[in-house]
């Protein structure tokens, strides 16, 4: 019904977002952009992060990257920076690389996220 229906436009009260709370900073990401790109690399509050939505839109993940320069992309079911590959658990696929740090990420309505994170970036 009306209370649970999602608004497919961006940044409307009932639009979906992917939200992260890093303590000193929280940020909401437009769900439509995430669906379109699959991967968003960002640096909120100088913390390098990557948010991933799987192609079937059933898996949402966030990771802290090792450096700002490291940019992750999604290939099949693997994240890669062109040098190292990572599983969606954040684990490095080879022993010469360090694993990524998993971050909590939330799929919420925009109005709900901004209510509980009033200073959120977007």
Give each language-model segment a name.
Residues 1-122:
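Mid-to-C-terminal functional-domain signal that highlights helix-capping/loop sites
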